[in-house]
Structures are given as structure tokens and as C-alpha cells.
Amino acid sequence: MKHLQVSTDPRRMTTQVEEVAAALACAAGRTAQLLRSGLDPTAQVPGLTWTAAETAAHLVADLSEHTAILTRTYHAPGTAGGPADQRNAAERGAAANRAQLGAFPERDLVVLAGLIEEAAAAFNTALAAQPGRGPVVTANGVRMDPATLVSVLLGEQLIHGLDLARSAGRSWSIARADALRVIPGMMAIAGDYLDRDAAQDLHVSYELRFGPGDRYRFVVDGPTATATRAEGTHGRPDCVITADPVAFLLVGYGRAGQWSQILRGKLRAGGRRPWLAPRFSTLIARP
């Protein structure tokens, strides 16, 4: 699929990446503060198979892994597969996550809090040292440019921070501005996570609208999908989804049901075939 970029101006691109990196550091600090607040490390995270400690360990391992990928010191565990690997990115990602946790045994939440802050700082240092870096290939075989990678890692931090808070019945907020920083990364790799079974024989174009200047076209053509910025896109889409950015993030990561967000007016459908809107969330596989 075509990988999105936020801007074609290198100076603007650098500024945007720095902005997302700063948001990542802030989110990591919030996560660390939560981990130091007396959470039960053995508490089950709602909706996941992980405990709070395992979720925190995943955040550390994931940041460290992507730092190693950026600095070319990463040694793949063999989960990405080769050309004959028919698994989608979500299935390969689940295998990579299992390998991560198996190789990283730390489960003390206070220790993990410090490690999350250190890992986020190390990632941002590696990111800043390579402003012109081209795409890298992650453990699940997905190609990402640095802007996409830092955006995706911010999403991981925000969503798993929510998971940790929910394990203890705590509150956790996600700002609209942060959701808008994550969405470009989500859209850039959405085609890699296409559920081929769900998309079989489907030919549809979606336009996703999050506000002025934040519109994307997602075109599904059977077993493949392409995401592009909607600005300058020719032709009318089949279905238009106007979404609150935070609601889209929560539904996209499987942390909220789409119907609850629809009833709250956070997701609205339009276009020539609006009945296709509820199907959109079923097209993206999750690890």
C-alpha cells in the first residue's frame, strides 16, 4: 500500500515529527506516574490476555525494539516471516508481542515505570539523530517511515495507558490533539492490517473526516487496500465517515464499540452508500 506522509516539506516534516515525539515523551511520563501509583501488577487488563505488569513490560520492550530498529541494531526473532508467510500484519504482530514478553522478564511496576521513561527518551534520541531516515521494517514486517513509527508508538502509549488505568478502575484521558497525532500513523499502515477474509469481494472507497485538513481516502479492492490523504483526491467516495478523533482511536484499537460512539454522535455516516460505515471497523485486523 502507499504509505502516508504528513508533509512533503522536510522542514515542516521535522517539526511535526518533533511535536509527536514530545507528545510520546509526555504520554510515557503519564504512564510511568500511573505505574508508580500502586497498581496491582497481577490485575487482568480488560479485553486483553495480559496483566498490568505484562502490559507495562510490553511498552518497554516495544519502545526498545523500535529504537534498535532505527539504529540498525535489531535482531529479528523470526516472527515477520518471508514471502510465503500468508499471515497478516496483526497475526505477525501477535507473534512478535509474545516473543517480546518472553525475552523481557521484568514485571516490577515501579522498575518498569522508570524503564518506560528511559525507553521513550532513548527512542526520541535515536529519532532525532536520523532526521532524513528512510522507512524501516518492523518486527511484524510492516514498513514505516519515522513519522509513521513515532505516531504509532504514541498510539501504543496512549491506548495501553488506558488499559493500565482500566485494570485498576482509574480514569485516563486522551486529548483530541494527541488523537490527531496518532491517526496519520494508523492510516499509513491500515492497509497492512486489512482483514482479507472480511474484505473478500468488497470494492469500496471510504473518506474519513476528522476536521479541517484531516481527511483520508481508504480504498478497498478485494484483498488489498490503499490509504491516501483525501486532499486533491478525485471522485466521490462511496461512504463518508465523519469521526471525533478520540472516538475513532478507541474504536480502531478495539477499546470502544462503534455503536456506542454512533449513538453519542461521535461517528456519523454519509456519502452514496452510508450503510457501509459500520463495516469499516471490521476490515482492520488487530493483534
Predicted features along the sequence, with ranges:
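Hydrophobic packing residues in well-ordered alpha-helices of helical domains and bundles
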Residues: 17-24, 52, 109-116, 150-153, ...
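A glycine-rich beta-turn/hairpin centered on an aromatic-Pro dipeptide
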Residues: 182-222
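Amphipathic, well-ordered alpha-helical segments in soluble domains
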Residues: 27-31, 62, 119-122, 126-129, ...
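Short, helix-capping/interhelical loops that line the mouth of catalytic, cofactor-
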Residues: 2-19, 64-133
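An N-terminal domain-cap segment
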Residues: 9-57, 66
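Acidic/His-leaning functional-site neighborhoods
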Residues: 214-240
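C-terminal interaction segments
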Residues: 233-287
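Short, contiguous alpha-helical
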Residues: 39-88, 137-195
